[in-house]
Amino acid sequence: MPSHTMELPRQIVVGEKNIDDIGSFLNSLKKTKKISLVSGSNVKKIVQKKIEASLIASKIKCYWYLAKTNDQKTIQDIEKKVRQSKSELVIGIGGGRSVDIAKLIGFNLNKPFVSIPTSASHDGIASPFVSVKGDKPHSLVATAPLGVFVDVDIIKKAPKRLLASGCGDLIAKITAVRDWQLGRDKTGEYYGRYSAELASMSAKFLIKNSVRFSKKGLHVREIVEALISAGVASCIAGSSRPCSGAEHLFSHAVDKLEPGVGLHGEKCGIGTILISKLQGQNWKQIVKALKDVGAPTTAKEIGLKPEVLAKALTIAQSLRPERYTILKEVDMTEKKAISLAKSTKVL
């Protein structure tokens, strides 16, 4: 069996009202004098004062760059500025876009990357993979974060929709792992049982606790820890296999056909409903869990048109033809896609 490299975060801190400790956290990871921060404008307004005070106390100079979009030009512009600043660390603060951009820039410049999520909408906060706009409408491999720093109090203040989206990304591990097993059985590809079990555990945790979440509200810290665990599973696997299967290809296909429809985790959750039925899994259980946590289970809820959904299912596998999924075993037509969506009440 060929070897693969595991890149894991060195330190993960999850706390409440601990953003003031960011300076000492960074120094514990790597003694540094200059860092570059990447965030959106709203996030900067919320956390700038406390973060800069902590960095000053730790004698760290920072350069702050705003990521208004995640297209190639924005990434290249920020990357050029980070290189010129001679920063020793690249920090991504915010949701998926800023964390992904910082992760990719750190990889391109061979600089350590640190993840500081301010929302929990997907599992990329601790994984080595990024989703950016470009020629390939799917995740690219970059590098795992050197550290992950989470202030749960900040994430609690983010819109509830973002946390529910994170739940959709978690439940996607059910179909992703099954697709990985298919790849092992049909093509002989490497299958990491431990990383697969770790990813599955995050999804099973959500299903097991969905009723509690529906009655008492989503437990932010638990969801965050599950997302981090899923990200670490992909680090151990050396690929996104345990976390990303046909349901993610469906999400990427929707992005390609109609950008801006739904959040990543929302599309993955809906994709999981569809793909789980194709796989012969308990799709009704998945629907119930998603409803319990307030995540969408229908195309209408995220503004996804039936014709776009159908087309997305027919082209999803073509986005990554080398990755074996259940879609390789189905002659998916738009008519079959509509029938599948109606049978699962996605349409």
Protein language model regions, located:
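A short, small-residue-rich loop immediately preceding and capping a beta-strand
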Residues: V82-I105, L109-A120
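Active-site segments that bind and position negatively charged phosphate/pyrophosphate groups
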Residues: R193-V293, T297-K300
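C-terminal charged capping/lid subdomain of soluble metabolic enzymes
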Residues: L170, G280-L347
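ATP/NTP phosphate-donor binding region
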Residues: M1-L89
